[in-house]
Amino acid sequence: MTIVHRRLALAIGDPHGIGPEIALKALRQLSANERSLIKVYGPWSALEQAAQICQMESLLQDLIHEEAGSLAQPAQWGEITPQAGLSTVQSATAAIRACENGEVDAVIACPHHETAIHRAGIAFSGYPSLLANVLGMNEDQVFLMLVGAGLRIVHVTLHESVRSALERLSPQLVVNAVQAAVQTCTLLGVPKPQVAVFGINPHASEGQLFGLEDSQITAPAVETLRKCGLAVDGPMGADMVLAQRKHDLYVAMLHDQGHIPIKLLAPNGASALSIGGRVVLSSVGHGSAMDIAGRGVADSTALLRTIALLGAQPG
């Protein structure tokens, strides 16, 4: 079955992680015609080494590739280095620029390693922040949405301490996240999603018994969203609403509220979309797996599902 109908840019992520390997493994499962719609961004040397490890050298012959990101040869599998962090950002940035310029229709980026990127001296809290910075947008306009196991969960905050997240949460930030996620759901074939907003505190604060945060932040956001004509329930306790599984879209206030259910139900099959920007970008719902990099045992299921998700014919 053909799964790729649109032009895609595929950045290989951290070249010392499993990105080069899963990129090649996913591409191997596509037809030649489908591969012709995908341009790969990243150091060629890392792809060559991954191909040798996985005995896929012949795949490189018809690979459409653009060199992006410097890397010492050979790749240091599993090593967390500033050079690999810089390469990650360079390859993803080149792919985003290609999409912004109309050369491709969407961007897929393999896993990054945040420590490597920070060691390169680059402020980074995930692909959503990178997308916002490359596009010149405010980071409060771009969010992460995980898709997997029948769930769609947008995160209002992401890679920051709980203290920082609580200081940054506001009704407007929640509204921004939901509006971006509803637009994305339309692109994914769910035009009028039923939305559930998680509470910040347990039991959505239990009528202020556990704090004022939900009455001050999530409840006003829900009221605003309803006035915009959206079908929104909440705020509700995340545990209760996830157990019911009655909604099309869930809104997590904190990182673990959204990541735990997705990684429990779809550990190797989730997509991680950066939403709210004028470029469609997705990564996968797992990390760079430095502990198994360069061994040829990485699972490309999540990447292949992400390719299918973004490669589908629009409309």
Swiss-Prot record:
InterPro entries: PdxA_fam (IPR005255)
Signal peptide positions on this chain: none
Keyword annotations from UniProtKB, A to Z: Metal-binding, NAD, Oxidoreductase
UniProt GO MF annotations: (3S,4R)-3,4-dihydroxycyclohexa-1,5-diene-1,4-dicarboxylate dehydrogenase activity; metal ion binding; NAD binding
Reaction(s) the record says it catalyses: (3S,4R)-3,4-dihydroxycyclohexa-1,5-diene-1,4-dicarboxylate + NAD(+) = 3,4-dihydroxybenzoate + CO2 + NADH
Protein EC: 1.3.1.53
SUPFAM superfamilies: Isocitrate/Isopropylmalate dehydrogenase-like (SSF53659)
Keyword Metal-binding among record annotations: yes
Sequence positions that bind a divalent metal cation: 159, 203, 255
GO term, biological process aspect, one: phthalate metabolic process
Keyword check for Cell membrane: no
Chain's role: Involved in the degradation of terephthalate (TPA) via the protocatechuate (PCA) 4,5-cleavage pathway. Catalyzes the dehydrogenation of 1,2-dihydroxy-3,5-cyclohexadiene-1,4-dicarboxylate (DCD) to yield protocatechuate (PCA).
Family, as annotated: Belongs to the PdxA family.
Protein name per its UniProtKB record: 1,2-dihydroxy-3,5-cyclohexadiene-1,4-dicarboxylate dehydrogenase
Record organism: Comamonas sp
Gene from which the chain derives: tphBI
